[in-house]
């Protein structure tokens, strides 16, 4: 299945990309995608966004689909999903 991830705000700054498509195995979950993203980009992010020891995003980093947060890492992804990765923290 193919999923598009759009990076926003400071996450876009650290990732260096606006968006990217991922081909994932059928049955992949939100947790699978977040782990993939963290392993790929986590080294570019500060510790308040990615915890490299636990291989987890900080709770202030959220993934959203259709305007709703993806709750629970076991939530299934679907072919064609568009996921927004954003931080609840923003400067101003």
PLM segments and residue spans:
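Ubiquitin-like/PB1-type beta-grasp interaction modules and other compact soluble beta-rich domains
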Residues: 1-91
């Amino acid at each position: 299945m193919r999923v598009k991830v759009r990076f926003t705000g400071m996450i876009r700054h650290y990732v260096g990309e606006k968006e990217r498509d991922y081909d994932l195995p059928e049955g992949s979950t939100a947790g699978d995608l977040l782990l993939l993203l963290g392993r790929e980009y986590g080294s570019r992010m500060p510790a308040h966004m990615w915890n490299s020891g636990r291989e987890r995003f900080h709770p202030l980093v959220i993934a959203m689909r259709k305007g709703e947060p993806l709750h629970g890492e076991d939530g299934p992804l679907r072919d064609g999903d568009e996921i927004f990765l954003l931080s609840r923290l923003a400067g101003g």
